[in-house]
Structures are given as C-alpha cells and as structure tokens.
Amino acid sequence: MRAPQLPRLLLCSIVASVLVPAPAAASSPELIGLERALSTLLAERPGDYGIAALDLRDGSMVSVNGDTSFPMASTVKLAIAATYLAEVDQGRRSLGDMIVGRPAAKVMELMIIRSDNRATDQLLATLGGPVAIQQWLSSQKIPGMRMDRTIAQLLRERGHLADSKDVATPVAMVTLLSKLDDGTVLTAQSRTFLLELMSRCATGTRRIRALLPAGTRVEDKTGTLDGITNDVGFITMPDGRRVAVAVFARGGRDRQPVIAEVARVIYDRFADSMRNALALFLQMR
C-alpha cells in the first residue's frame, strides 16, 4: 500500500525551510560604527575572519561574518565542559568522579587550561561521545553549532579550512557563552568553576588578551588547527560590564596578532561608550 503523499504546497514549504539560508546576523544600530571599524581592519588582513561580540548587560551585539560557519577547533571544549557540568548540576555526575584515574575536575582543568586533547576525549567518552554534546546543544536551542567527531578523529583528518563538520558561527558561539554566563544552563557553582578555569587559559596569551590594558579580566578558550586560529570568551570592562566575544580566523597569516587587534578595537569601543555615558551624566548634574 502506498503511503499518502504530502500536499504539494506543504512539501514545497518544507523544502524551502531547509534550503533557504537564515537571515544574516545584524549588528545593533548603536554598534554599526564598531562593525565598520572591524570590517576596515579586516579588509587589510589576509584570510577569512568571523567576529561576534555581545554586551551581556543590554544585549547589543556587533557582528562581522557572524552567520558564517568556521571550524571550532578546541573552542568546542566549552560545549563539552558545559554538557558535563549540566549533568553535575542535575545530580547525575560529580566533579569527583574518576575518569581514567583522575577526578573529573582535574580532567576538565587540563581540557580548558592546557587544551589537553587526550583529557578532552576521555571526558567526551564518559558523556557518550560527540552525539551527547550535539544533543545538549540542540536542547539549549543553539543553532549554528555542531560537533561531529572526537578530537582524535578531528586531528587525523585533513582539509580543515573547508571542513563542514565541528563548526560554529560566531553568533552561535556568543550565544553559548551568554547561556553559560547568565545562569540558564549552569548553577552558580558550576558557572564559577568553569569561568575560573577559563581565566587561567594558558594558550591564549597572544590572542584576545594580548593588547588589552593590564589587569583586564579575560576568561577564554582558544582553538588551533592547521590554518585555523580562534579565541572565544569574556572581557570584563572597567565598569564591570561583561562582553562575550568570539573571533574565528581561517587562512591568511599572522592570525594571532589580528585577533589581538580585533579584541582591542572591541574593548576600546565599549570603554568609550562607558566614558561618554559618564561625561553625559556629569553634564546633566
């Protein structure tokens, strides 16, 4: 017996929903100037860059190629950490659980601070592999981000510049960062644990942190593959405001210095807005 056919109009609408790309990520009106400054900077640099920066206080965002997918490399380890910590919060796991002879807390420390790939795959195996991370991302409604392979599998394969697996858009990454920060997916205790590890990231001294004023608090996670250089995380502004930042770089050269320049441009724009607001307040007194 033949299965009933979908009405033609319904079938066409389903196909269209799959094939039509999502609307381009747009910068907030008040940050168009910052978008232009970043675009001008990147126009003079070889390679492809994707940037998103989200003000966690008021929700304003700047985006350059923010809806373009880039290989995540080791920045995916934040999603792995979040998946494990969410299960800790649900009482299903503990940071004291032993994973290949070490407490889970130590394994996660190696994964985030040192970007240890073996520790990452050990934690990932405990969770059930990449499919478990993808299920968690889907449950949190974070489109534009996917995990397909273990780190060992990822490193064995070539062609990272054109890879369509294990990718994220900059906007998807700052969406994940926002959820990690605002308490919607992690308890305060788990959030504090993860951010403390990110603040000690040992692989990012030449990226987001490099050109920021001394003493600026940064919590980040880097990612590196052949031809791929990434850094994502949080910058705390002088007024306490926090900005989630994702910078993905593909191809070209001198990618680390460019990421540092991008971070400084973002920092200066948000710092200027703080100073301008203070000046206006003083004038109105």
Model regions and ranges:
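Structured C-terminal helix/loop/strand segments within mature extracytoplasmic catalytic/sensor domains
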Residues: 27-41, 69, 126, 175-205, ...
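Active-site SXXK
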Residues: 59, 70-99, 111, 245
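Conserved catalytic neighborhood of penicillin-recognizing serine enzymes
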Residues: 93-133, 161, 166
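Bacterial N-terminal signal peptides
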Residues: 9-21
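Mid-domain, small-residue-enriched loop/turn segments at the edges of structured enzyme/sensor domains
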Residues: 48, 121-182
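Soluble periplasmic/extracytoplasmic beta-strand elements of cell-envelope proteins
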Residues: 50-55, 63, 79, 112, ...
